Every structure is written in structure tokens, then in C-alpha cells.
């Protein structure tokens, strides 16, 4: 009997060890995001499509079947000349044709379904989709008889379509249609993760991005991007990391790679644990095709037992074409005196936002490469079209010259000498941000050497909810000699619907229809 009990207890303990090992393994999944340089010149539309498809298949093969999910970026595959239908769901793999399939499903989409099956991975791609119009009269039909959508399509490991999303917030896409109402797209995997997904410009607005996180509780998010970076607060990887941090979610962000047009930036981020993999092409005019891989925790707040990514501080010329924040002239700012061994405590206010700054710095030369300003801004910013965000921010940012208009410009002499730097040894920002039902407040940080955000070992962040405000403290954990941006960035999605700054003209612009708005701007 004693022997039996010993053997029984040994068997139980062995089983528990196996169970524990499996549970450790099952705490992660392997994700890949692709920074992709599209082929867009040098052939017919069909030839360009085939060249991009070949690039996609080559990248998928390079993963060697190790990934659980691969994400490709926005607008890097087909064009409005080589459209495809996209089914919402399919019971069977799209790899083989079924009798009731839409005849407008293009062969390239089937090739990708076959690749998903071959490599046993979930696959997210972005396509230009053709949707035949169901017209009841000539008045309801467009001249071309079909609509075009900017669409994400998701395949499971067998190549079946399990999710589709059509972009809601369009950005400089005159030939693309919107759906009648926004779509909220999710899918659940066999590794017990439910993903939400959207496209590029959507990330700056509440719907659908924040709907996924706040209304549905999604903690794993995918975004396909062709993002134009803007200094000092909205470069691609900087914004991706801040967004994942503020929402405490895992984010898989796949970006197009056209640095000559200001487009680059991909990464995998685990909430407030920072970047697990990331890439910004800043020192070249030609983009890359690269698969970034990371072991992603099922729980974004579960501590990761891997070394933090800290890129080397190697200064190289910045060739990435960058946009500039359009409202800098309206900031309330104060210029830091470029005096060696200085320290300052400063309180700056604008409208309902006051921020307290504590800064200590030293110079490694009497003529540093950048000047710096402390600034606060409450206002509304415009993007390239008649689309707006209400912003509250306060921070420190680099300026090419003495004027505030030079902030967010990269120095032309991008041979960053070691002795031309400003070293910040102490930096703290304390801000009280008015509470609103729908807003997102995130850390916005950027290093001039790498164009990446600061990692958790370099940044401390805390939030305290009070009666009418949220008190946020942001602090530099260690000295830093290559800061471009160190700021608290608040996006207030419903500012005017919730008793905001009271700009009546802006409120009216938000209420009238886009057609009338375009007419007014033309006038």
C-alpha cells in the first residue's frame, strides 16, 4: 500500500509539473508584424500586384511556420485597378474555390489564404475591396456601379476568412468609400485571444479604436498602417507605443515603409511594458521589407521575463520626411536657457490646463544642437482634411532654433556630435487634466538618436483620479542626452459635446455635414 501511495503521489507531482510547464508556454503567443516597402512603379498594375504578392509570400516563408499570427500593413498589396471582393466570413478555406463563392474574389487573395494554411498561421492583410452596389434606381448608383473600401481581411490557420473591417476614418483617400455606419471588427483565435482590428487613421479617433478597448474590453489590438509621422508628438512608433501604454493593451502595428514620403514605423507593444519589437526607418530614403517577431504575453500586464529593448544611441542623419505640428504658434511656451548646470521649476497654464515642470540639465558644449521649450496647449488641431482632434498637452520638446515655429524641425546638420548634446539629469511634469467621459491621455516621448519612445526603465508614469481632474505625473528615471520629446498628450474625443473649451465656431463645424464643411472651406 505504501509503495502504491508513493507511486501515486509521484504521478500526481509529475502531472502538476507538466501542467505548470504547459501553463508557462501558454502564457504567450508568437506574433509577427511586417514593415513593408511596396512596389508601386515600374510595371502594369497587375505586375505591381504580383511583385507585392511575391514579397508577401517570401516574408511569410521566412517565418518558418513559427508564428501564431502575421500582420501586413495598409495599402501595400493591390490598388484601385486590381480590386478584389472580400467575403465577411467563409466556412471553408478560401484556398479552394467553392461553388457559391463571389466571382469577384481575386486570385491573389486565394494565394494568401493558401499561404496561411501552408504556414499554419493567422494572417491579417489590407486590400482595396470592390463591393458591387445594390442599386434600386439611378439616383442611388455611382457612375462606376461599385464602391471601393480600404479593408482588413483576416484568415485563420486554414485560410478561411474569419473577420473583415472596412476603414471608417479615411485620410486623403478620395476614391475610397465609407460604410453607412462604423464597423467594429473582432476575431477569436485557437490560442484563446480575441483581437480587435482597425486601420491607420482610425487610431486617432474614438470610433472604432477606443470602442474596442473601452466598450468591448479588447486587450489585443491590431492596426494596419501607412502613417505619416509628425513631430514633435505623433511619429509612428512613438504614437503606437504611447497608445498601447495608455490603453494597457498589446498592440500589433504593421506599417508601410516609404521614408521618402514620411512613412515608416512598425512594432509590437505590451502595454506599460513597452516595445517588444519595433522599427523606424529614419536614416534611409528607401524602405525595408522586414518581419518583426516577438513573444507576446496573453496578459499585457503580466511581467515579461525578457530583456528590455534599448537601441544604441548612434546618431545618423534623419532622412525621413516629417510633418510638423500645425498649432505650435498657439502654444504657451518658455524657452530653457542653454546654460551649463541649470535647474528650473516652472508652472505654465493655458485655459483649464496647468502643468508644473521640474528640470535639471547640463550642456556638453556651449552651442547645443537643439534648443528646448516647455509648453502647454489646449486647442483643436486639424489634420490634412476637415478632420479634427481636441488636444490638451504639456511637455518638453526640441527646437531647431530660438522660435517656437522651429520646434519639431530636425536639424539640417544631422551629424550629431557627442559634445553638442543637452543632458537632462532630472525631468518631471505634473499636470491636472480635466476629466471627460471619452478621452485618452498617453505618454509621448521620443529620442533624437533613434526616433523611438522611451522604455519603462527610462520613464515613470502615474495617474490619480480626483473630483474634476486627473493628476498625471511623468518623470525621467535616468539621465538622457538625446531627448526630442517628453510630454503628456491628451486626446479629448468628445470635447465640445461635454462642455469643453466653448469655441462655438468649432462646435458648429463639428455639427454640420462634411459636404457643407468642404463648401465653406472652399469659399
From Swiss-Prot:
GO molecular function, one term: pantetheine hydrolase activity
Gene Ontology cellular component list: plasma membrane; side of membrane
Record keyword Amino-acid biosynthesis present: no
Coiled-coil features, chain-numbered ranges: none
Compartment(s) where it occurs, according to its Swiss-Prot or TrEMBL record: Cell membrane
Glycosylation sites: 64, 177, 192, 330, 468
Positions of the CN hydrolase domain: 29-298
Bilayer disposition of the protein: Lipid-anchor; GPI-anchor
Gene3D superfamilies: Carbon-nitrogen hydrolase (3.60.110.10)
Enzyme Commission number(s): 3.5.1.-
Record's signal peptide: 1-19
Tissue/organ expression: Expressed in third instar larvae.
Active site: 74, 167, 200
Propeptide: 499-523
Domain of life, source organism: Eukaryota
Lipid-conjugated positions (GPI-anchor amidated asparagine): 498
Broad class of where this protein is predominantly found: membrane
Keyword annotations of the record: Cell membrane, Glycoprotein, GPI-anchor, Hydrolase, Lipoprotein, Membrane, Signal
Expression induction: Induced by ethanol.
Protein family (similarity comment): Belongs to the carbon-nitrogen hydrolase superfamily. BTD/VNN family.
Protein name: Vanin-like protein 3
Species: Drosophila melanogaster
Top-level taxonomy: Eukaryota, Metazoa, Ecdysozoa, Arthropoda, Hexapoda
Amino acid at each position: 500500500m505504501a509503495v502504491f501511495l508513493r507511486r501515486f503521489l509521484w504521478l500526481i507531482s509529475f502531472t502538476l509539473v507538466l501542467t505548470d510547464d504547459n501553463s508557462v508556454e501558454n502564457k504567450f503567443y508568437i506574433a509577427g508584424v511586417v514593415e513593408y516597402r511596396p512596389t508601386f512603379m515600374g510595371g502594369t498594375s497587375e505586375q505591381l500586384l504580383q511583385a507585392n504578392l511575391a514579397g508577401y509570400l517570401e516574408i511569410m516563408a521566412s517565418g518558418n511556420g513559427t508564428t501564431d499570427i502575421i500582420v501586413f500593413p495598409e495599402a501595400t498589396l493591390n490598388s484601385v485597378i486590381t480590386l478584389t471582393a472580400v467575403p465577411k466570413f467563409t466556412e471553408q478555406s478560401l484556398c479552394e474555390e467553392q461553388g457559391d463563392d463571389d466571382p469577384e474574389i481575386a486570385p491573389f487573395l486565394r494565394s494568401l489564404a493558401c499561404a496561411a494554411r501552408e504556414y499554419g498561421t493567422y494572417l491579417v492583410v489590407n486590400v482595396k475591396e470592390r463591393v458591387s452596389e445594390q442599386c434600386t434606381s439611378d439616383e442611388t448608383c455611382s457612375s462606376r456601379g461599385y464602391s471601393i473600401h480600404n479593408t482588413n481581411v483576416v484568415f485563420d490557420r486554414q485560410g478561411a476568412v474569419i473577420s473583415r473591417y472596412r476603414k471608417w476614418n479615411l485620410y486623403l483617400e478620395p476614391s475610397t468609400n465609407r460604410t453607412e455606419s462604423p464597423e467594429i471588427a473582432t476575431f477569436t483565435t485557437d490560442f484563446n485571444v480575441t483581437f480587435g482590428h482597425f486601420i491607420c487613421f482610425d487610431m486617432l479617433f474614438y470610433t472604432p479604436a477606443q470602442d474596442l478597448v473601452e466598450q468591448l474590453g479588447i486587450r489585443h489590438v491590431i492596426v494596419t498602417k501607412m502613417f505619416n509621422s509628425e513631430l514633435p508628438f505623433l511619429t509612428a512608433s512613438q504614437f503606437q507605443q504611447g497608445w498601447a501604454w495608455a490603453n494597457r493593451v498589446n498592440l500589433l502595428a504593421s506599417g508601410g515603409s516609404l521614408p521618402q514620403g514620411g512613412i515608416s514605423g512598425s512594432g509590437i507593444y505590451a502595454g506599460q511594458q513597452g516595445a517588444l519589437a519595433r522599427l523606424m526607418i529614419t536614416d534611409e530614403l528607401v524602405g525595408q521589407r522586414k518581419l518583426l517577431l516577438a513573444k507576446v504575453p496573453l496578459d499585457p500586464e503580466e511581467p515579461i521575463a525578457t530583456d528590455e529593448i534599448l537601441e544604441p544611441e548612434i546618431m545618423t542623419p534623419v532622412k525621413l520626411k516629417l510633418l510638423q505640428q500645425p498649432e505650435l504658434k498657439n502654444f504657451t511656451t518658455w524657452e530653457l536657457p542653454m546654460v551649463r548646470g541649470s535647474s528650473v521649476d516652472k508652472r505654465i497654464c493655458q485655459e483649464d490646463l496647468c502643468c508644473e515642470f521640474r528640470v535639471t540639465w547640463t550642456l556638453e558644449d556651449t552651442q547645443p544642437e537643439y534648443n528646448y521649450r516647455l509648453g502647454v496647449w489646449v486647442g483643436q488641431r486639424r489634420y490634412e482634411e476637415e478632420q479634427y482632434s481636441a488636444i490638451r498637452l504639456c511637455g518638453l520638446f526640441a527646437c531647431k532654433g530660438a522660435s517656437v515655429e522651429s520646434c519639431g524641425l530636425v536639424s539640417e546638420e544631422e551629424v550629431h556630435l557627442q559634445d553638442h548634446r543637452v543632458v537632462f539629469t532630472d525631468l518631471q511634469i505634473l499636470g491636472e487634466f480635466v476629466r471627460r467621459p471619452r478621452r485618452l491621455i498617453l505618454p509621448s516621448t521620443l529620442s533624437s538618436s533613434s526616433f523611438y519612445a522611451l522604455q519603462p526603465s527610462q520613464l515613470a508614469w502615474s495617474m490619480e483620479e480626483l473630483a474634476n481632474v486627473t493628476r498625471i505625473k511623468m518623470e525621467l528615471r535616468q539621465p538622457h542626452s538625446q531627448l526630442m520629446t517628453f510630454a503628456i498628450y491628451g486626446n479629448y474625443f468628445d470635447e465640445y459635446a461635454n462642455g469643453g473649451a466653448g469655441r462655438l465656431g468649432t462646435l458648429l463645424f463639428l455639427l454640420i455635414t462634411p459636404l457643407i464643411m468642404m463648401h465653406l472651406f472652399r469659399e
